């Protein structure tokens, strides 16, 4: 019997043979587990997806983004809760993979090889960050540059609310000008803000040399987030590390 928070090790344990060969891990993989409702205690089956290939199963992309892929709803009391478990998101067309809760070094070692040299391989630690990262890479944006830009936004605009600053897409802002759109997610609320796309392009010209000075190793899994960006800035701009 599993509770909502007990699923990670079980799913990781079954990865061994499946991730050794590219043809195997390219396929979407699901399994059924028994979960005990945290509210009423009733047990019921729940389908988890340890790997989703959005070319083979495009509907899973929307299920991830609207939360239904991770949502457990009790058939008895209708209580809903989020089930956190490892998910490998694979987009073979855009050539990227994003791994939620891929923390085990031995498992990550299995997910390597020359066939991944052209892939962007990213690690994230929450569903929100998984959704954000898929948005960024799907649009062909450099996620390292975007994380640096988010740090710059925080430093330059103290009016940005407290919370997790997440990229939400590209759209039109004031005067129909193209802008990057962000969600600021906190425990209390979610607010949306924009930043001019032209400002982002100018930022890219300035900071691209910094990224070129530290190219990412091919076929290596890396967690590109705010901590990554701040560490990069500290190495190259130590006088601004505060």
Question: Where are the predicted features?
Answer:
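Long, contiguous alpha-helical scaffold regions
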Residues: 94-228
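N-terminal cysteine/histidine-rich coordination modules
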Residues: 25-101
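Charge-dense, extended regions
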Residues: 226-242
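Short, often N-terminal, low-complexity regions
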Residues: 21-22
